[in-house]
Amino acid sequence: MNPIHARFSSVEALRHSNVDIQAIKSEGQLEVNGKRYEIRAAADGSIAVLRPDQQSKADKFFKGAAHLIGGQSQRAQIAQVLNEKAAAVPRLDRMLGRRFDLEKGGSSAVGAAIKAADSRLTSKQTFASFQQWAEKAEALGRYRNRYLHDLQEGHARHNAYECGRVKNITWKRYRLSITRKTLSYAPQIHDDREEEELDLGRYIAEDRNARTGFFRMVPKDQRAPETNSGRLTIGVEPKYGAQLALAMATLMDKHKSVTQGKVVGPAKYGQQTDSAILYINGDLAKAVKLGEKLKKLSGIPPEGFVEHTPLSMQSTGLGLSYAESVEGQPSSHGQARTHVIMDALKGQGPMENRLKMALAERGYDPENPALRARN
């Protein structure tokens, strides 16, 4: 059986993800809420969803696919979500006025059109997740900064962590991964202390916060954030946390554009919306390149990366999400976007319009909350 690369904690997580529909159709399977489903093309051209034990009934299922899409079972809901996402993807033959075979290549204009279409779709998905966050806050009457930030932090994949002997071995590897002469390591909870004031070895060995709090990874050749800066969030299965931390340290040694990194303690991996972050000087294109280099350095198999995009961030690939900083706004991604939502909640009218106005006023792209405004 081939490994499953597309995993989602619930139908809602699938609905609000930036999943690649074509990739799922090619792979032919996905996992939702711990259950595996087969993906097939129905006779009417729609996407059909099957449980593995239904393979013998495939022909009959395909004939009734349209009926099943409207059902209420988890399988039917998955089919509905996938078909809605497929319908939202611009059809290249309609957009370009002719059919185009990607394997045979084409003009640079066609390639640019494809990239532009993908970019617009991703922006819409990013904005949709941002609007959902704001509307949920408004419905719950949560207008305070802390409550809004809690909603964002709670948007997590909630991976189950290993236990017993495996957990202890992983923790030992995790500690070994954060020892490098070119980097300084310090718990975020002690940002107010100088490096020489903290006994890191003792903290890791004795303080219970070491297993759940964030560790900063800062190059000793201090690298200040520039005007064009952002963050790349990396999501992996908890058992690969130490392997990822080591790759992050190696990437920082090789690329001066990475100003620092941050990893959460192993007991908290997958329990919040982001568990590993790289802060970079550059733009979206730079983040994409660094993300791919990090994947290669890590040696983590494709199935080790999780499909999860934090609210108001832009997916740049499986397990990778990106968002930019704006000068004068909070450096924390969650806090910065929380302030935008707080502004929008004070206004009147459609939430979409309120959010776009609030984003523009704070220097963000009104069409994509992950990016800063371009002049």
From Swiss-Prot:
Coiled coil: none annotated. It comes from the Bacteria. Gene3D superfamilies: 6.10.20.120. InterPro entries: HopA1 (IPR040871). One of its GO terms (biological process) is symbiont-mediated perturbation of host programmed cell death. The keyword Oxidoreductase does not apply. Keywords: Hypersensitive response elicitation. Unknown. May serve a regulatory function. This is Protein HrmA.
